[in-house]
Amino acid sequence: MAWSVADSRSLYGIRHWGAGYFDVGDSGNIVVRPNVRQRKEIDLYRLVRDLGGKGLDLPLLVRFPDILQDRVTRLCGAFDKAIAEQGYGNRYTAIYPIKVNQQEAVVKSIIATQDVSIGLEAGSKPELMAVLALAPKGCTIVCNGYKDREFIRLALIGERLGHQVFIVIEKESEVDLVIEESRKLEVRPNIGLRVRLSSLASSKWSDTGGEKGKFGLSAGQLISATDKLIAAGLGDCVRLMHFHMGSQIANIADYRLGFREAIRYFAELRALGLPVDHVDVGGGLGVDYDGTHSRNDSSINYDMAEYAHVIVSMLSEFCAENGIPHPRILSESGRAMTAHHAVLLMNVTDVERLPDTVAPIDKAEELSLPLRKLVELANLNDEELVTEIYYRASHCVSEVSEMYAEGRLSLQEKALAEDLHATLCRRLHNQLQASQRSQRQVYDELTDRLADKYFCNFSVFQSLPDTWAIDQVLPIMPVHRLAEQPTRRAVLQDLTCDSDGKLKQYVDQQSIESSMSVHEVKQGDEYLIAVFLVGAYQEILGDMHNLFGDTDSVNVYVREGGELEISGIEEHDTIEDMLRYVHLSPEDLLNRYEAKTRECDLNPEERSLYFAEFCRGLKQSSYLAV
């Protein structure tokens, strides 16, 4: 049966991780639906072509702010529905922690979402300065992180500007600072207390919670802090309890366990006479990056609706049992709000693959023993001995490598051994059955060995740092040609001079593989690949390894009537920009270039040509111009 776009949907799992925002169109190109209710589809391949006409180059980060607002609407809608179903006597406010992505367009889009209650969180003085400026009057602002006097003064000033600013005490030492600075400014603060839970959730970020967590007050510290605040006349200012179990919680059962402990703290604080009427459940709401809807670190076994139901129902039942008024619910679900809205696009610049065949060998009997064995194995076509042939061939290759290192084989002989082994492995791979348990290990080894290397125009460290740092899985697939069957498997390599500069995990149907299905790319072909769900943390965590800088980026909005609005175009960092960042003056470098061209035996025409090349080079992108 001929390959279809439905086969590509299944292969890459786009309908499992795409959350309705991404799909494969009938043309074989990826389509984006920024607002599911509008039903407007954007052909991603055509969009890249159009943006190229506006001077934007690959690699390119495309943001869809409409997705941000849809995510906020979905999140708030899930809580509103749970509140209505439970008859809960208070409201929900979604708090966006700007550390997840501090881009102005991101923050503005989130707080501009209509018909929802939205607030902001700051975890540092720079973030608080940004939040105080961007937040609309009356906005709920949560201040987390380590705090000094300046931080606390800024928060108190924010209160006077008409915001509802919660200063969350994370360390006992912050209590005295809040007392002293609130007296100096004569501002009654809104105070929150962060409790340190014993419960831990299983995730890549589980160490942000639990007893060994970096932040939060232990039971003893909580008592000490409340005693101090009451003694200082600020007991009535303690209005919020906060906890955080960790980011990307995969298993909803872990969350239930931790939340049960957290609401006990809420009851105890109320019993102390503190008017706590806000519960900030922190982060933890995950994203189904691999589409498996499981307990994998890169997935979640629940959705927004179940998450909201757990929180609202448990609070509702607990408050009813203990005669406590229902508190307002806050959550800091930044990852769930932002991950889907950004897509990284890159082009394949080169392909490296092992040979499919080897030329006929003359006088095989004159070859060295391990090479003769390889030739014999290559001619042995016994499907019952497939795994044994592989192990024997691998041993022969090891012998060849030893003999070459000892000077007993020539470079040509070593190259012949490598080609023979590659072609033999390709034949064996075709004969193996992945479904047979006895052959699965060899099948997987050969799949890895035979995968092509697709060199792509991007930097893992700059654009996808979590894939390197914590083995984060992100969905990756071709942007176009999806009506064609992909016939190759490849590992994507970046431009950096670093062996870690590659993507090691790929969503393949509903599993994670070490290579991905791709189409044949011949010399001169354009082949675009997209990495999805990069809107959370990746932009701000990216570093400048090998001095690769920011890519081109753009915001794409869908306006009423379905027309697209392109805005927020930001050009890539130039080589000059990157050198300045590491305190290398381009002006000084130009002077040095000029001096060096004069010191060499160059004629005036060559000197002028070379110097002009240096000048032009400083203005270019750090990425490849292809």
Swiss-Prot record:
- Which family, according to the similarity comment? Belongs to the Orn/Lys/Arg decarboxylase class-II family. SpeA subfamily.
Can you name the source organism? Chromobacterium violaceum (strain ATCC 12472 / DSM 30191 / JCM 1249 / CCUG 213 / NBRC 12614 / NCIMB 9131 / NCTC 9757 / MK)
| EC number assigned by the record | 4.1.1.19
Q: Which EC class is this protein assigned?
A: lyase
A Gene Ontology biological process in which this protein takes part is: arginine catabolic process
Any single GO molecular-function term of the entry would be: metal ion binding
Q: What is this protein called?
A: Biosynthetic arginine decarboxylase
The N6-(pyridoxal phosphate)lysine modification is found at 99
Catalysed reaction(s) here are:
L-arginine + H(+) = agmatine + CO2
Its annotated pathway?
A: Amine and polyamine biosynthesis; agmatine biosynthesis; agmatine from L-arginine: step 1/1
Keywords, comma-separated and alphabetical? Decarboxylase, Lyase, Magnesium, Metal-binding, Polyamine biosynthesis, Putrescine biosynthesis, Pyridoxal phosphate, Spermidine biosynthesis
